[in-house]
């Protein structure tokens, strides 16, 4: 979750204060109460006494960073990554992984239990806390005065770039590629034209996209192509107009059931492959799919849930707002010989009950909306009268809001599980099953 803070209009009298930390929120921030005001403090754990530097302050709450740990928690740990103090990629490496997960789970479950006390809270869906990211976007910036080039992630709370030679949350092949990229760009003829690099570890190798401004010099194109051949990369370049593939094939990943999902370098895919598979398995299990089911998959993308569902049901219809993704989903269905699947483009923030696909009978529905949630679609969705709705969420705030809406339409929250898709960060995802009463 990205939080945009607006500084308080009047500067505080003191820029630091001492606080005792009472709790931990799901984003890994310590929570303190000082003179009736709630403070959310980075790099602080429960039971600690810390000196806090104020980042911003509102009337009823404020944000700060602990600049000195006066009384440390006995379980506080040293960060695994040497860049952790500066890099904005992770927020929670000082917190033991069990404590991270407990805080995330408690925050989600407390909110939902207030709405549906009878809901069953299932074990968390987890995987390894390190080397799990199969995708990363790296900023690249050349400093003309120093003649130095930086490549990495943004520094915490600034726009500066942390120059990364490795990353402990990236899958190992991606992390191992970082120093080689630094070496490549050190010989670049026009480094000021470099924009960013995207890396994706697909099941058929690493795909790389280089974003640049202006024309790519022939010497740089040759360097880049030779590098891609040497490292066996699928290579793409993007200028101000288009993306061009210079080497390799299209990237894809394969699910446990053999479903092969091909995607383009800029397409959204779940960054944690292991957790993605567990999430799919959980969705299929909770929906209790049978060969008689007709399933509707909303916000379906290129078919990450749709195609595995199709192997167990009578028919599945996938709805996606982006036309290009619909075409890719159709292509994936054809390549996987899934002939009981239909995909349609629809803007789900507009009424859709009159669209022809909505006139079909669906007894089960899956939706995986963006961070803004699905409040705009839930009224029409509930009118379809499905017996089960499975909701995959990447934002606890919109999940709680949408749960309240579903309860108003006589759906009951039966069970929910937290998904630790991004260990050592403040991100929280979940999967929830609703049943018609």
UniProtKB/Swiss-Prot annotation:
GO terms for molecular function: 4 iron, 4 sulfur cluster binding; iron ion binding; RNA binding; rRNA (uridine-C5-)-methyltransferase activity. It catalyses: uridine(1939) in 23S rRNA + S-adenosyl-L-methionine = 5-methyluridine(1939) in 23S rRNA + S-adenosyl-L-homocysteine + H(+). The active site is at 394 (nucleophile). It is an enzyme of class 2 (transferase). Gene3D superfamilies: 2.40.50.1070, Nucleic acid-binding proteins, Vaccinia Virus protein VP39. Keywords: 4Fe-4S, Iron, Iron-sulfur, Metal-binding, Methyltransferase, rRNA processing, S-adenosyl-L-methionine, Transferase. Residues 10-68 form the TRAM domain. GO terms for biological process: rRNA base methylation. It comes from the Bacteria. CDD domains: AdoMet_MTases. It holds the Pfam family tRNA_U5-meth_tr. Its EC number is 2.1.1.190. [4Fe-4S] cluster binds at residues 81, 87, 90, 167. Belongs to the class I-like SAM-binding methyltransferase superfamily. RNA M5U methyltransferase family. RlmD subfamily. Catalyzes the formation of 5-methyl-uridine at position 1939 (m5U1939) in 23S rRNA. This is 23S rRNA (uracil(1939)-C(5))-methyltransferase RlmD. It comes from Pasteurella multocida (strain Pm70).
């Amino acid at each position: 979750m990205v939080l945009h803070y607006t500084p308080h209009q009047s500067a505080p009298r003191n820029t630091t204060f001492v606080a005792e930390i009472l709790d931990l929120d799901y984003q890994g921030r310590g929570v303190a109460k000082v003179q009736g005001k709630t403070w959310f403090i980075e790099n602080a754990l429960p039971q600690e006494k810390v000196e806090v530097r104020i980042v911003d302050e509102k009337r009823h709450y404020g944000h700060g960073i602990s600049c000195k740990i006066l009384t440390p928690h006995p379980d506080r740990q040293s960060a695994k990554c040497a860049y952790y103090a500066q890099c904005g990629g992770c927020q929670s490496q000082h917190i033991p992984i069990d404590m991270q997960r407990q805080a995330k789970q408690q925050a989600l479950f407390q909110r939902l239990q207030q709405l549906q006390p009878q809901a069953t809270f299932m074990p968390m869906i987890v995987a390894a806390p390190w080397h799990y990211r199969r995708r990363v976007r790296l900023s690249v910036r050349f400093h003309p005065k120093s003649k130095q080039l930086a490549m990495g992630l943004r520094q915490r709370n600034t726009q500066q770039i942390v120059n990364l030679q490795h990353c402990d949350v990236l899958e190992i092949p991606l992390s191992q590629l970082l120093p080689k990229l630094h070496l490549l760009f050190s010989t670049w003829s026009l480094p000021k034209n470099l924009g960013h690099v995207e890396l994706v570890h697909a099941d058929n190798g690493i795909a790389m996209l280089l974003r640049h401004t202006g024309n790519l010099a022939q010497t740089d194109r040759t360097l880049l192509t030779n590098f891609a051949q040497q490292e066996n990369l699928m290579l793409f370049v993007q200028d101000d107009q288009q993306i061009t593939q210079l080497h390799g094939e299209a990237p894809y990943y394969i699910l446990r059931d053999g479903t092969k999902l091909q995607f383009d370098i800029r397409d959204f895919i779940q960054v944690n492959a292991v957790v993605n598979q567990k999430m799919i398995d959980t969705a299929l299990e909770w929906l209790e799919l049978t060969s008689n089911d007709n399933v509707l998959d909303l916000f379906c993308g290129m078919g990450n849930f749709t195609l595995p569902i199709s192997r167990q049901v009578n028919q599945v219809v996938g709805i996606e707002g982006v036309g290009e993704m619909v075409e890719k989903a159709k292509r994936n269905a054809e390549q996987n010989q899934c002939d009981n699947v239909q995909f349609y483009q629809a803007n789900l923030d507009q009424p859709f009950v009159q669209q022809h696909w909505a006139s079909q009978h669906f007894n089960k529905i899956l939706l995986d909306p963006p961070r803004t949630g699905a409040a705009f679609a839930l009224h029409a969705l509930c009118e379809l009268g499905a017996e089960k709705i499975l909701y995959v969420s990447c934002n606890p705030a919109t999940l709680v809001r949408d749960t309240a809406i579903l309860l108003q339409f006589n759906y009951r929250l039966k069970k929910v599980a937290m998904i630790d898709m991004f260990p050592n960060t403040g991100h929280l995802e979940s999967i929830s099953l609703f049943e018609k009463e």
